Amino acid sequence: MLRTGVIAKKLGMTRLFLEDGRQVPVTVLHVDNVQVIAQRTAEQDGYVALQLGAGEAKAKRTTAALRGHFAKANVAPKRKIAEFRVSPENLVEVGEEIVADHYFEGQYVDIAGTSIGKGFAGAMKRHNFGGLRASHGVSISHRSHGSTGQCQDPGKVFKGKKMAGHLGAVRVTTQNLQVVKTDAERGLIMVKGSVPGSKGGWVTIKDAVKKPLAESTVFPAATRSKAVQAEAAAPAEAAAPEGDN
């Protein structure tokens, strides 16, 4: 059963202290006004998915086509757009806002982002090669990758050979990151360990594909309207008269 993920912005890393005194390194992710922009249905599009938007963009910096797309959904222009495949029963209404409580403490998630670009890198940095010897006749080529193999036949270097080249700035997914803490009021999700990308970069968060979903998972999604209804119901329950003693 697939449910939607969320779009978040990477704010940086810090640490949290657990009740037993242990400290945990966490990456802080900001769920910034994530709203449903469009639905993709099997009848109309051939697949089932939700299109989400996050952040805020200036209208004058948004193309006319996108302005019309956002206006149709009755949402403000967004900085980042992404689609998430979902099950038909987990579609969410257009315009709904998904909050940080979509994930709970202890849950495992998969996070995808664009890794930090490192430019042109040598074989030792890019592929963890050992390099050549420091002495014994080796000059200048200490950090080179060495021979690329082959002879007159086949007379070429095979495709995919590990060599120096561009490193980073590619799509990377880190699996099975544990959610340590969530802050729905500030829209923060704190996950244990590192997350691909630089500070200020956009990432997508999904339920871990290699871990089963817990019974406490919210379906189809944790939305702002549900949170408002829960807040309104809480005072009413507290004010209800108790029975005679």
From Swiss-Prot:
GO terms for molecular function: rRNA binding; structural constituent of ribosome. Keywords: Methylation, Ribonucleoprotein, Ribosomal protein, RNA-binding, rRNA-binding. It comes from the Bacteria. Pfam families: Ribosomal_L3 (PF00297). Residues 230-245 have a biased composition (Low complexity). Gene3D superfamilies: 3.30.160.810, Translation factors. GO terms for cellular component: cytosolic large ribosomal subunit. The modification N5-methylglutamine is found at Q152. Methylated by PrmB. GO terms for biological process: translation. Residues 224-245 are annotated as: Disordered. InterPro entries: Ribosomal_uL3, Ribosomal_uL3_bac/org-type, Transl_B-barrel_sf. Coiled coil: none annotated. Part of the 50S ribosomal subunit. Forms a cluster with proteins L14 and L19. One of the primary rRNA binding proteins, it binds directly near the 3'-end of the 23S rRNA, where it nucleates assembly of the 50S subunit. Belongs to the universal ribosomal protein uL3 family. This is Large ribosomal subunit protein uL3. It comes from Paracoccus denitrificans (strain Pd 1222). The gene is rplC.
